[in-house]
Each structure stands twice: as C-alpha cells, then as structure tokens.
C-alpha cells in the first residue's frame, strides 16, 4: 500500500512531477523529531498537485498551520474553491461528468473542445473555472497542463473509457484538510516572510523544458486575482 493510500485526502488532479510515489523517501529525510514539535507550520512554495501537502498534514497532526503557493492562477483558484465552496464544485463536476460520460468518442472530443474553449475564455465564475480545470485534467491527454505562448490551454483530448471526473469523497476530504491552509498565488519568494523557528519548508520547483524549442509552459500572465485567500 502506498503511503498516501491510508488517508482520505489526496491530490485531486494528476500532475506532472507529482510526488505520491516518493512519499516514503521524503519521510526518511524529514527531521526525526518532527512529530514531537509543537504547533509546526508547513510551507510549500510550489504546491503543484499537493501530494506532499495532503500527506504531511494527515501524517503529522502537530502541524497546525500550512501555507501553500503556486504561480499557476487556475490551479490556485481550484485549491481555494475546494477549501471554501466544495459542494458547489461537486455539483458542477457532476453536471460535466453526467453530460460527458454517455457520449461516444467523437462527441466526447467535441464536448472536450467546447469546455476547453470555455476555460480559455477566462470568463467563468471561480467555481466554474475550478470545475473546468479538474474536468480538463481528467479528460485530456495524460493529464498534462500545458499552455501555448498566448496562455491558452492546448492539451488535446485523451481517450479514457470511464474517467472519474467527480471524486466527491476526495474533494470533501481535501476541503477538510485545506481549512488549516493559507493559499497564496504568485512568486514563491513571498513565502519567505513566514520563515521562523517552527517552520518546515518543502521546495519542489517546476521543471525546465528539455530543449529551447519545447513548449510545455506551466503558466502565463493572467488577470486572475493573485492575492492570498
């Protein structure tokens, strides 16, 4: 059994570079007395899919506060909606799931492209944005997040027989864990002001492209709110 499987809260999306498979190795390099330290704060400047975040907050209940950050505004919007409005998010995801799953392959691709265009128009509510973010992640090719030079999400449709678009149990468990998490969006350096003696930082920055011609952009300039929740 993988270390994260024993807990209900876990990553709500697939994410390139996610650390679910490495949690045992990460635990080995944590301070040996971490579980005995009172009122710890955990800070993750590049949260991504949150595998370490969700695991460590369930493994170490003495970590009473966490601060996460990411420069990807749509990802952070999704974290905030899960924290503050998870039931409306579940409602919207169930709607997308119920519309998508009965379709044949051709119609699924067309439906995917329509939702991708909605997402790229950036004219949706926060709940709709979060739902589209998760829907696209669950139905696109390999769960990639990639945007072009204009900041448009451009990953093609994937071919999955029965993707789990709305995982209600995980979303509710994640929402419960996120109640003790402060959520920031922007440059990772802003987390430095929270450093003090009882803080554990975990750094896992995004990967650089393999070549100069690679177009695997993690984010792009966005008008979305970049202030803390």
State what each model feature region is:
Residues 1-35:
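S-adenosyl-L-methionine
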Residues 33-37, 194-198:
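Glycine-rich phosphate-binding loop signature in dinucleotide/nucleotide-binding domains
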Residues 35-40, 62-63:
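Short helix-terminating capping/connector loops at secondary-structure junctions
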Residues 42-56, 68-72, 134-141, 186-188, ...:
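Conserved proline-anchored active-site loop of SAM-dependent methyltransferases
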Residues 58-179:
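Class I S-adenosyl-L-methionine-dependent methyltransferase module
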Residues 147-157, 207-220:
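Mobile active-site "lid"/loop adjacent to the S-adenosyl-L-methionine
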Residues 171-196, 202:
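A mid-sequence, solvent-exposed acidic-amphipathic segment
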Residues 218-229:
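Single conserved hydrophobic/aromatic residue that forms the stacking wall/gate
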């Amino acid at each position: 059994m993988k270390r994260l499987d024993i807990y209900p809260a876990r990553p709500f999306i697939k994410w390139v570079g996610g650390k679910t498979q490495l949690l045992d190795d990460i635990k080995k390099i944590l301070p040996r007395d971490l579980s005995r330290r009172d009122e710890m704060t955990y800070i993750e400047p590049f949260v991504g899919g949150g595998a370490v975040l969700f695991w460590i907050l369930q493994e170490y209940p003495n970590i009473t506060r966490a601060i996460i950050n990411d420069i990807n505004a749509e990802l952070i919007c999704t974290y905030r909606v899960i924290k503050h409005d998870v039931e409306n998010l579940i409602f919207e995801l169930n709607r997308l799931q119920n519309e998508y799953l009965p379709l044949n392959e051709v119609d699924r691709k067309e439906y995917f492209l329509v939702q991708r265009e909605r997402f790229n128009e950036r004219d949706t509510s926060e709940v709709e944005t979060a739902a589209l973010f998760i829907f696209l992640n669950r139905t696109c090719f390999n769960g990639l997040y990639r945007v072009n030079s204009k900041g448009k999400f451009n990953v093609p449709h994937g071919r999955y027989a029965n993707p789990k678009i709305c995982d209600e149990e995980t979303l509710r468990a994640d929402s419960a864990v996120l109640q003790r998490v402060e959520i920031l969006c922007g440059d990772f350096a802003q987390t430095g002001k929270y450093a003090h003696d009882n803080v554990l930082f975990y750094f896992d920055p995004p990967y650089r492209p393999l070549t100069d011609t690679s177009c695997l952009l993690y984010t792009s300039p966005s008008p979305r709110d970049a202030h803390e929740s």
